[in-house]
C-alpha cells in the first residue's frame, strides 16, 4: 500500500532533552500472559498481500543464545504447507509464521518505549516488525499506527533514503542492512485514487526530516539492536541503538496536531514476522508476477528480548487489563435526551452496512433533527451496526 507524506508543523527540540526517565512497565518474556497469539492470513494477507499463515506453534519462549537465564519470545517463519494453511478463500499457502498482540491486556499512552530485537536473514521477502496500533474502534489508519522498528523495505524505498544515517547514496543496500520506523494516521489530503485509505506516513518524506531509516552495510542481522520511540502529547520521534550508539532518525520533530490526533489515545503492542506483500520486493498474495520469489533461508527466527516503557518527562502511562468499565446513560440514536457518553461516527466510531443489503430510508427522527434510517433492498439477509 502506498502511503503519503504531508507537510507538518514543526517544534524544536534539542538532543539534550531526549532522556528516558524511570521504567514504569517491562515485558521480559518469561511467559506470554500479556499476549494474544493471532492466527490465519487475515483479509487479503492482513491488508498487505502477505503470504504467511500465522500459527500458535510458531511462537514460543526461548532462552537467548549465550545469555543464560535471559528469555525472549521467538517468532519463527517456516516454509510449509498443509490442508489448514490457506488464505481467506481457501487457496493454499506455502509459509507460516507468528504474530502476537496485547490488545485488551496491555496498552500504553506516551513515554519512551524501548525494545531489544534480533532479526534473522530476511533477504528476500522477510518483513519483521515491533509496532503499536491504536485501541480505537475506528478502522486503520484512523486508529493510528506507530512502527517502533520494521525491516524488509523494498529497494525503491531504500534507494530513496540512502544518503542519510549511514547510507552511501549508491542505491546498493540490501534488506539486511536497513531498518526503519514510522507513524501512520488518516489525513484528508492523503486521500487520493491510488491511496484510498487516506493513510499519511512520516517515513515516506524524501527529505528525511521526520523519520529517516538507519543503514549499516555490515548488516543488522547478526546482533541485537535496541529501538526507541519517544512519544508525548506534542511529538513522536524515533531512534536505533546499534553497538550502544544511539542514532536518531530525524532532523525535524514530527509535531502531533489536530490532523494526527490519533496519537493522543492509548495503543497496544504487536510483533510479527511477515513474508512478502507490497511492503517488500517479493510478490503479493494472488499475484505471483507482482514481485520476486521468497528467497530468505528457513526457518527464520526473530527474537524479541524485552519491551519496556519509561517516562519521558512527566508523560508515560500503561494500562494492564481491559479498558476500564464505564457506567451511566449511553446515547443510542439520541439527539435531545441528556446522556453521560456517546459516539461520534468518523471520530470515535464507524457505521458498518452489509454491502448491498440496505439503502437510505425515510423514517423521521424520534427527537431532534438527526437520525439514521435504512430500508432493506429485499435481497434476503441484511445487517448494519455501529462499532
Residues of each region from the PLM?
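GH16 jelly-roll
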Residues: 17-320
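Extracytoplasmic/periplasmic beta-strand context in beta-sandwich domains
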Residues: 27, 128-129, 144, 305, ...
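Short beta-strands within extracellular/lumenal beta-sheet-rich domains
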Residues: 211-212, 375-387
